[in-house]
Amino acid sequence: MIKTTVVGSYPVPSWLPTCSSQEGLRDAMLAVIKTQEMAGIDVVADGELYRWDINHAETNGMIDFFVRPLEGVEQLLDPERLKVWQEQPGNSFRKKPPGIVVGELAVGALDLQADYELYRGLTAWPKKFTVTSPYMLA
């Protein structure tokens, strides 16, 4: 028998930006999973919501999720650099700066195990955990 599954990211629920917390993220993931179960999908996915970041809603935080852990990237800026960043046109919608390259880029580490643990207990159905493809990172 051929099993059904889904591909790609689910849209972020409209209420998540106003309820952005670990509990809100868990509830959003649960809504995505239960929707798939009710539709009869055999192998469910979390909709890639584990990458959500309220500070970077225009990309759901997906780009920063992969960039922040790299060596040579900082997100915490000294007050002077933070002020310069905040004054740039187009940054007013962000609460925090994105990852900013401050040196030579080098290998970083993702904690995908912790992200999977957030999702694992939400369903007894067969599940898959999505990681991005290399072209997204290029």
PLM-predicted stretches and their roles:
Residues M1-A138:
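Domain-level signal for soluble alpha/beta catalytic cores
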